[in-house]
Swiss-Prot record:
Lineage of the species this protein comes from: Eukaryota, Metazoa, Chordata, Craniata, Vertebrata
Localization: Membrane; Endoplasmic reticulum; Cytoplasm
Top-rank lineage group of the source organism: Eukaryota
A GO term from the CC aspect: oligosaccharyltransferase complex
Organism per entry: Danio rerio
InterPro entries, alphabetized: TMEM258/Ost5 (IPR007915)
Protein name: Dolichyl-diphosphooligosaccharide--protein glycosyltransferase subunit TMEM258
Length: 79
């Protein structure tokens, strides 16, 4: 395989939007994280729903995970 015949890889996400994605994703993740903590503190053991807890925690962790991923890309740690 010749080097000249290869096509250069381009990222599907423009590096100029890494800061915006970081802030938006982390903000959404922090919202769901705060909602989870408020739900845990204000509900009694009789009114808690484990499926609702798992759903909120899953959504929060997904947004926080992708937010941290784009934060690392933003600061130059390419993972």
């Amino acid at each position: 395989m010749e080097l000249e015949a290869m096509t250069r890889y381009t990222s599907p996400v423009n590096p100029a939007v890494f800061p915006h994605l970081t802030v938006v994703l982390l903000a959404i993740g922090m919202f769901f994280k705060a909602w989870f903590f408020v739900y845990e503190v204000t509900s009694t053991k009789y009114t808690r729903d484990v499926y609702k807890e798992l759903l909120i925690a899953l959504v929060a962790s997904l947004f926080m995970g992708f937010g941290v991923h784009f934060l690392l890309l933003w600061v130059g740690i390419f993972v």
